[in-house]
Amino acid sequence: MQHARKKFRVGRTSSHNRCMLANMLKSLIHNERIETTLPKAKELRRHADKMITLAKKNTLAARRLAVGRLMVRYNTLTSKEARQVKAGDLSAYNVDRRVIGKLFDVLATRFSSRNGGYTRILKLQNRVGDNAQKCIIEFLA
């Protein structure tokens, strides 16, 4: 029996869950709105609210914690990013660095007077293939 166990489980390994949530959180910070399934959005909301609260502290320790939780890679490029940089497109260079900047500069100042509840979940129609409940998770304006 799983009494009082609040672990996020969607049929994946723990490392896959951790990476998936970090990638979804980076996408949410970058785009401020993503479409996903309801269980993933509910778990993502917990992590997003914690990251905004961390960003509002605006200390070096908070930045280092955010880099670790978002699994930001500063010094490595994927092969696709390397090709884009080689071709002269510097906008593709380290998207993760811009995510940390946006989190601490834009979102933290936007929510500086708010004490929680930084995201909203809007339910959509179910997905056609597997009838999964879809939703949109977004930051409040």
UniProtKB/Swiss-Prot annotation:
Record-level GO cellular component terms: cytosolic large ribosomal subunit
A GO molecular function held by the record: structural constituent of ribosome
Key word Ribonucleoprotein present: yes
Pfam family name, one: Ribosomal_L17
Keyword Lyase: no
Biological process (GO), any one: translation
Keywords, alphabetical: Ribonucleoprotein, Ribosomal protein
HAMAP family per the UniProt record, alphabetical: Ribosomal_bL17
Family note: Belongs to the bacterial ribosomal protein bL17 family.
Assembly description: Part of the 50S ribosomal subunit. Contacts protein L32.
Protein name: Large ribosomal subunit protein bL17
Gene it is expressed from: rplQ
